[in-house]
Amino acid sequence: MRIGKVKESILKRSVLRQLHNHSEQGSPASGEDAGVLFMLEFMPEFTQGFSEKNGVAMAVNPVEGWTFAAKRAVYGAVNSMLAAGAAPKAISLSILMPEEAEEKQLKALIKEIDSLCMQENILVLSGHTAVSPYVSTLILSVTAMGSITENRKDITANKENNTANKGSIADSKGNTKQITVVNADLDLVVAGTVGREGAAMLAAEYAKRLEERYAPSYIEAAKHLFDDGSMTAVADILQEKEVVSVHDVREGGIFAALWEMAAAANVGLSIDLKNIPIKQHTIEVCEYFNLNPYMLRSGGTLLLACANGARIVEQLKNAGVEAAVIGQTTAGNDRLIRYDDEARFLEPPKMDEYYKVN
């Protein structure tokens, strides 16, 4: 396709006509400068601006490359909203493609995004689609929007005394309300299996190489590790009173997510490596490429800090999500990963293991 914004004919044929989830809340259109989301239908409190108990959550998630791009875009948007304690409502897309990209690739991408958005009951609100000489593969930037209530989860701690039991946020009138934050002696729960996003991508991109060691049927199964990457089914569980904080596990894997949560809350960690849920397919793919599966992108996985992890794990399993208590938060700053009688310190996030394969 030509460099610059895609032709109007391509935009209409391969983008707008592939989007079917329109409503009075908003819909994308050619020539419009912005998408408009009418909040009154699903957030009546917006009639007078932000209310004391509700607001809007927004997040931006980048997706690089064509492999499972639609799933990574939509599931990433949905899970980032759920982790923030928000109900996902809409996404906006910025799509940049290399010059050699074909219209059929764009059409297939939008068609799958539309299908997933309908499945998740969210809108594609607006977007920008262009071909750029500065990119060598698909670059998809997804802005997610959700409605949020006073029950939102927060991980910010009092960094002065490391005891933060409560924090506060200001409403539209400048008043404050209390929110629970992460402190020591909480259970850490992983919902979903770690490394599955990265393992599925590697299985799809390097199937021929993997066939040197594994059966084609085994590799095919690995490609589907990320098929159930949405956590919408457990949204209500994430709002249970025992759940203090939720963190979306993505680039850098579970080790990065653990560090980010602990650093934000100024707490220590004690993690049992053997308790972290992981699929054998993920382990095998990582062994072939000599990768650390705990540092591999893990879209479709959430990290929870809970007051009663065992109860939350039981609920997650009853909802069909693999889950486990993997450790606890501790006082101080020691962040330890334990394996049997050995222990080592967790290090700050490094480059995702996915990028090591070429």
PLM features per residue range, with description:
Residues 1-65, 84, 93, 111-125, ...:
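Extreme N-terminal cap/leader segments of soluble proteins
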Residues 2-3, 7, 317-358:
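Acidic, Ser/Thr/Pro-rich beta/coil linker or hinge segments at domain junctions
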Residues 26-29, 57-59, 123-127, 189-192, ...:
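General beta-strand structural signal in soluble alpha/beta enzymes
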Residues 31-32, 137, 296-301:
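Short Gly/Ser/Thr- and Asp/Glu-enriched loop/turn motifs at secondary-structure junctions
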Residues 38-45, 58, 62, 87-159, ...:
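Glycine-rich anion-binding loops of enzyme active sites
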Residues 66-91, 108-119, 233-237, 256-260:
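Small-aliphatic-rich amphipathic alpha-helix that forms the alpha element of a beta-alpha
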Residues 98-100, 222-297:
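Active-site-proximal betaalpha loop/short-helix elements
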Residues 305-311:
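Helix N-cap motif at beta-to-alpha junctions
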